[in-house]
Amino acid sequence: MAAKIRKGDKVMVLSGRDKGRTGEVFEVRPAAGVALVRGINIVKRHQKQTQSQEGGIISKEAPIDLSNIAIVGKDGKPTRVGFKILADGKKVRIAKSSGAEIDG
């Protein structure tokens, strides 16, 4: 199945603690159905000291379920994603709300 949300997409959080916030996807894990979004779903982790790394409490992004994020359209609102096959046979993603191409 083609990916509706990809690395580099600007997305908005639809539910949860960060509802309404936007960020850029920097990693997608399709098998787990989750994505990592820069600046969203920040958690604190206690890091044990190693020879190469200092110990302490670090903040990092936790995965967020793909069902809880949506691509932000050109109008700044979240939109669902569909697919369209162009005349030359190329498959592109389109915004369901406006019909505009997302990439291509």
UniProtKB/Swiss-Prot annotation:
Listed GO MF terms: rRNA binding; structural constituent of ribosome
CDD domains, sorted: KOW_RPL26
GO biological process, one term: translation
Domain of life, source organism: Bacteria
GO cellular component, one term: ribonucleoprotein complex
Keywords attached to this entry: Ribonucleoprotein, Ribosomal protein, RNA-binding, rRNA-binding
A Pfam family matched in the record: KOW
Subunit details: Part of the 50S ribosomal subunit.
Family: Belongs to the universal ribosomal protein uL24 family.
Function: One of two assembly initiator proteins, it binds directly to the 5'-end of the 23S rRNA, where it nucleates assembly of the 50S subunit. One of the proteins that surrounds the polypeptide exit tunnel on the outside of the subunit.
Protein name per its UniProtKB record: Large ribosomal subunit protein uL24
